[in-house]
Amino acid sequence: MNEVRLSENSYGKSDVEVFLCLGDDLWLQIIASIKIEGSFEAVYVDGHNSQILPTDTFSNHFEDLASSSQGADLYEIGVGVLDRLMECMEDAKVGSVQLSATRWRRLLGDSNSMVAESPSVEVSMTRGLDGRIEIAGYVERRIIRSSGSSFAGFRRDGLTDKEDVESRILYGDLRASWRYCGRPTDLFESNIEVAERLFAAFGSASSNSLQENIYKAGAMVLSARSDIDEIAISFDSFGTQKIFLKSSDRSNNSRLWRSISRPVGTSYAKVVRDE
């Protein structure tokens, strides 16, 4: 019988939530998930806990840094957590923090109520043993592109029944992640700007396929943002179907559609800079 061994391991704390009051009319909600990977065989295999901090301590460091950060700097908070934890645990090899940040603003005319702004900002920071920090941004949004996307000239076999389409509706979930070359001046605002630029690029680039569309969108983002060295984009597309109205005195004129939620088409591309 072959012997068994521990191959990989990690542990951490998920969904640690705080609200920071940044002013009379502005609060910031931050949700953190913290993970540490390392050589913790003694903990997993032998049950010796002297190598690790309790995960409650992860939460305490996050809350302490969030409360002391000037202007709720996401980079300062995330990297601060990683620095503290990895310096305390000599067997830690890689640390990562995912932060989801949402601004809340007070409703006009109501001194007691606040409402969450959209969108939330999703970022992550990863630190290795060399202290180097890798920063990434994320976005996920359901979008509709009403025209400008064709699909024709594709290969056919005996079971291909799809017709060429000169212009179609694209409706589905757009997801993207990108990696920063360095530290953005304002990580919150930078993520919002990249996401808006991505959506604008996806909607404006004419294309002969969804695959070409997501590549062009990624290339346009990299061309506009020199501080990003790669972006990965995926799109899960739902089918759409024109609704034929039963009333004899009314016509659709391509204004009324329904979504077909299954099956879902998927496309993915990673766009990088040449070395």
Which residues make up each language-model segment?
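N-terminal intrinsically disordered, cationic/polar leader segments
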Residues: 1-275
